[in-house]
């Protein structure tokens, strides 16, 4: 329950920050263009707070914190007095209307850049891209446990998250990747990871595991959380015990334990389960039982072991961080557009489209990891909001920009009928996209 409420809270905080910047972009440029803004609202529904400025704008915080809007004076929506007609949005030139509409996504792009600048100044704690286990394609490439990946295809890597992202992009493009690594004793080498050998189709969310790379910080002995009543573990294993090895094979993850128990069951003999209980190290002889589903079980539930301290953090000076933030924003934009292209062309699965449930979970997880992680999450979300809003779909900012582009080409605005038809098409497309996102959330 605690995680559920925390996820909702951090999602509200995230959306509120991003929506405020987005709508302020529209508001600020509208005022510069001489448009009267009637209402600036963060959230929908019943106003929880409101205040009217000297310019006549009502600033509102709504009860439903799932978006926001800027309502401008417009003759197409209500009667406008003769004295105020020059302040109506629809009376402005097409270039002014383009500037007002584009200002929202641009504000989110600038926010992304600002957040990344802050991140480079304060530093984001992370884990280095140090390999804990190398199997399958990684082992074939000559990667060994203890190797730290420093670059992939010439692009510098400072953390496991960067390495995972670059490997995923290369795998989706069906390209091999050249990994520059530093070994445990400082020796440098390069290895070609043959990602083109990955069996198609594959789950893009687990590329590193599929190629056989397990990151060192993730490999921690599992902790027993619960004992099933009547199981063979009852009376022998206790909650809090840490599983160290099974039949002499080191246990470094919950997945390890599962695979080792299955092997014990298939081999048909008891196995020695080594555990640590407090300061004691014990060896227990146990035989797994086969469930009705054909899975071998000890009768325990486990939690991942304690995560070690972060071992990677880089800070930069206030001025030095500016070009870094600009370059990182450009890189993230290119990566995001590349992913969208892959989804559209079928190179990547539509499962990569996340909805509010996934966003809430990620917001909570990043907030738990620390300020730097949450800032990075906000920068990604802000950039995504900017890009999505520029889609040429009616009802989104990009759809309005499409209307104005057509107006520039034909010399006159689209008819009300054509714009209304576009709105219906836009609603249908957006509803389909949101439905897919919710479906992916529920499956995930």
From Swiss-Prot:
Q: Which residues are involved in binding Zn(2+)?
A: 22, 26
* Chain ranges of the PDZ domain: 192-278
Q: Where in the cell is it found?
A: Cell inner membrane
Q: Any idea which UniProt keywords this protein has? A: Cell inner membrane, Cell membrane, Hydrolase, Membrane, Metal-binding, Metalloprotease, Protease, Transmembrane, Transmembrane helix, Zinc
Name what cofactor the protein needs.
Zn(2+)
Q: State the Gene3D superfamilies in the record.
A: 2.30.42.10
SMART domains, alphabetically?
PDZ
Name the predominant localization: membrane
GO BP annotations listed? proteolysis
Q: Which InterPro entries match?
A: PDZ, PDZ_6, PDZ_sf, Pept_M50_Zn, Peptidase_M50
Active-site annotation: 23
- Give the Gene Ontology MF terms in alphabetical order: metal ion binding; metalloendopeptidase activity
Q: What is its EC number?
A: 3.4.24.-
- Stretch forming the signal peptide: none
The first-level EC class reads hydrolase
> Where, by residue number, does the polypeptide cross the bilayer?
98-120, 371-393, 418-440
Membrane-topology annotation of the record: Multi-pass membrane protein
SUPFAM superfamilies in the record, alphabetically? PDZ domain-like
What's in the GO CC field? plasma membrane
NCBIfam families on file:
RIP metalloprotease RseP
Q: Which family does it belong to?
A: Belongs to the peptidase M50B family.
Supply the name of the protein. Answer: Putative zinc metalloprotease PD_0327
Give the organism the record lists.
Xylella fastidiosa (strain Temecula1 / ATCC 700964)
């Amino acid at each position: 329950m605690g995680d559920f409420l925390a996820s909702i809270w951090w999602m509200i905080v995230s959306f509120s920050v991003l929506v405020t910047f987005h709508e302020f972009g529209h508001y600020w440029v509208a005022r510069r263009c001489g448009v009267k803004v009637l209402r600036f609202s963060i959230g929908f529904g019943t106003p929880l707070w409101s205040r009217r400025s000297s310019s006549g704008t009502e600033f509102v915080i709504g009860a439903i914190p799932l978006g926001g809007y800027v309502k401008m004076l417009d003759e197409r929506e209500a009667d406008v007095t003769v004295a105020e007609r020059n302040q109506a949005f629809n009376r402005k030139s097409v270039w002014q209307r383009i500037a007002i509409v584009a200002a929202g996504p641009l504000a989110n792009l600038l926010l992304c850049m600002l957040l990344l600048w802050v991140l480079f100044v304060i530093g984001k704690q992370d884990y280095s891209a140090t390999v804990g286990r190398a199997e399958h394609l990684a082992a074939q490439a000559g990667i060994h446990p203890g190797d730290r990946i420093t670059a992939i295809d010439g692009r510098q890597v400072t953390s496991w998250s960067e390495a995972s992202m670059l490997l995923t992009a290369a795998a989706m493009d069906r390209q091999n990747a050249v990994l520059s690594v530093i070994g445990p004793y400082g020796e440098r080498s390069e290895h070609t990871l043959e990602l083109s050998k990955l069996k198609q189709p594959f789950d893009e969310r687990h590329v590193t595991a599929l190629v056989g790379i397990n990151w060192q910080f993730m490999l921690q002995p599992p902790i027993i959380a619960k004992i099933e009543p009547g199981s063979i573990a009852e009376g022998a294993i206790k909650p809090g015990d840490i599983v160290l090895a099974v039949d002499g094979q080191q246990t470094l993850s919950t997945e390890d334990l599962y695979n080792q128990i299955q092997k014990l069951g298939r081999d048909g003999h008891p196995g020695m389960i080594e555990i640590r209980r407090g300061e004691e190290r014990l060896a227990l002889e146990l035989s797994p039982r086969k469930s009705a589903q054909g899975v071998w079980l000890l009768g325990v539930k486990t939690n991942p072991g304690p995560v070690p301290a972060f071992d990677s953090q880089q800070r930069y000076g206030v001025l030095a961080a500016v070009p870094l933030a600009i370059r990182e924003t450009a890189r993230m934009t290119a990566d995001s557009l590349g992913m969208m292209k892959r989804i559209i062309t079928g190179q990547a699965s539509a499962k990569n489209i996340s909805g509010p449930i996934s966003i809430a979970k990620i917001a909570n997880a990043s907030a738990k990891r620390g300020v730097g992680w949450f800032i990075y999450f906000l920068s990604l979300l802000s950039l995504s909001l900017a890009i999505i809003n520029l889609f040429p779909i009616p009802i989104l900012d990009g759809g309005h920009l499409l209307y104005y582009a057509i107006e520039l080409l034909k010399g006159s605005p689209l008819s009300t009928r054509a714009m209304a038809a576009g709105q219906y098409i836009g609603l249908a497309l957006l509803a389909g996209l949101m439905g897919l996102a919710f479906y992916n959330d529920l499956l995930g």
